[in-house]
Amino acid sequence: YAAAEKPLSVDDIQLGLVEISQRSGAPAAKEAADGDTGMPALRTRRTDLHGRTPNQVAYLRDITTHDITFGIGPAGTGKTYLAVACAVDALERDAVKRIVLVRPAVEAGERLGFLPGDLAQKVDPYLRPLYDALYDLMGFDKVAKLFERTTIEVAPLAYMRGRTLNHSFIILD
């Protein structure tokens, strides 16, 4: 805890950035340029799914090789879509028993009570990007069946405290 109280210096940050770029950026850039990412094909309805940029290649590799992966980037870079694709792949391979999609149910300064309807109707607009990715990767009918069986679950972040999430692929978007 003592180290947490000490502020980071500019040199520490620079060294960290250099180390990160040497570890993940350079190999991913070469692989993406060659068109060979070394990634096995993801099992989804889309057969052409792969990382299109060096960062996407590194992101997919990190998701498939680590238990926890953080994806940070601007809107439209594929963070949610690629994470959902990896979750669908893990479910199809029986590596996980369910997919739990979590998203904050409100925008900054809003409250759920302001929207009409029950909880599902209130959070639905905020979860639309996750639904869109699922429908594209699995098809509407299959997604509907998996929702009925609670193999795929969508939950607001506020309701996740105290949950047991064994054998689950969790995407916090």
How would you label these PLM feature ranges?
Residues 50-64:
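Pre-Walker A adenine-sensing motif
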Residues 81-150:
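Conserved P-loop
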